[in-house]
């Protein structure tokens, strides 16, 4: 079973407008509301592919209940931890080919809630084979919270995938307990190392072999339309992908994480894991809906992806 963690979920609200006018009333004809957050995108894709997945994280208030109901409607198993605060809204205003986002900070997690959730996780770990952690940390949690979870998972011998950024990712990298997989894009890699990393293979090899990444089994670097670069133990791979018509790239990274988790839980070969991860990301980009893949197109796309050792 794959356990997904979304510690700062949201209700994602989309407001499509032909034109967005400031300092006046804008009337929206059609509104969509979905259970949001990077980890929930991962969850949906895994569920669509038929994987056994369990969603967890913090939920509170009426908005938290909305997320629970959406997941129930999708027949996705969940075990969230209830908090006193209210789950946040994230608003996207789609206008004139652009997207303006208004993101609420979200609830503040109390110290007792933070510690109690770790106990809750230990129970969930008994059922898990792989853990995928995605997104930002809510207010109130120390930036080392992901590092704490990785430590707990490592003690249980559970592989972990971490898709985060900023200080929470840095705290994990600087800790003694390393995740099994990280998935930075090239900009995030450059930011972590405070240098410019290019798509040149030698530049990428030098970057992912820096001491800060020591002990991490898999480093998978997204290169956008150029595919991906990966390091597994001491072996390097370049992933070449076919050209596709990109409809909506948002959520493609989350779908890639879903592919990695699926590859790990089925103990697939390096080549097949990388093919699956990239196929999931591309399938998401080919759809309008974020965190969604057309499973019927998977096999054909999988065949077109090339993984070479470099």
Curated annotation (Swiss-Prot):
GO terms for cellular component: cytosol. One of its GO terms (biological process) is lactose catabolic process via tagatose-6-phosphate. The keyword Kinase applies. CDD domains: FruK_PfkB_like. InterPro entries: Carboh/pur_kinase_PfkB_CS, LacC, PfkB_dom, Ribokinase-like, Tagatose/fructose_Pkinase. Pathway: Carbohydrate metabolism; D-tagatose 6-phosphate degradation; D-glyceraldehyde 3-phosphate and glycerone phosphate from D-tagatose 6-phosphate: step 1/2. PANTHER family: 1-PHOSPHOFRUCTOKINASE (PTHR46566:SF5), 1-PHOSPHOFRUCTOKINASE-RELATED (PTHR46566). This is Tagatose-6-phosphate kinase. The lineage of its organism: Bacteria, Bacillati, Bacillota, Bacilli, Bacillales. The gene is lacC.
């Amino acid at each position: 079973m794959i356990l997904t963690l979304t510690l700062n979920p949201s209700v994602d609200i989309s407001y499509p407008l032909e034109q967005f006018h400031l300092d006046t009333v804008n009337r929206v004809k059609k509104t969509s509301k979905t259970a949001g957050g990077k980890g929930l995108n991962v969850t949906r894709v895994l569920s669509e592919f038929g994987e056994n997945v369990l969603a967890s994280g913090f939920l509170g208030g009426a908005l938290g209940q909305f997320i629970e109901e959406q997941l129930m409607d999708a027949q996705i198993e969940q075990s969230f931890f209830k908090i006193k605060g209210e789950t946040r809204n994230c608003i996207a205003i789609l206008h004139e080919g652009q997207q303006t986002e208004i993101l609420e900070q979200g609830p503040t997690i109390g110290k007792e809630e933070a510690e109690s959730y770790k106990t809750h996780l230990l129970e969930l770990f008994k059922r898990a084979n792989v853990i995928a952690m995605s997104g930002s940390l809510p207010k109130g949690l120390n930036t080392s919270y992901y590092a704490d979870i990785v430590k707990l998972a490592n003690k249980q011998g559970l592989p972990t995938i971490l898709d985060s950024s900023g200080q929470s990712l840095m705290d994990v990298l600087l800790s003694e307990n390393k995740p099994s997989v990280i998935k930075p894009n090239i900009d995030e890699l450059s930011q972590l190392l405070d240098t410019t990393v290019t798509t040149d293979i030698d530049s990428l090899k030098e970057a992912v072999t820096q001491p800060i990444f020591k002990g991490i089994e898999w480093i998978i670097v997204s290169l956008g339309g150029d595919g991906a670069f990966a390091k597994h133990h001491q072996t390097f791979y370049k992933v070449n992908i076919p050209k596709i018509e990109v409809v909506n790239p948002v959520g493609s990274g989350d779908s890639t994480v879903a592919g990695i988790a699926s590859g790990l839980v089925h103990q697939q070969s390096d080549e097949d894991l990388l093919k699956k991860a990239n196929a999931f990301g591309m399938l998401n980009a080919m759809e309008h809906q974020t965190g969604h893949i057309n499973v019927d197109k998977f096999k054909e796309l999988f065949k077109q992806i090339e993984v070479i050792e470099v």
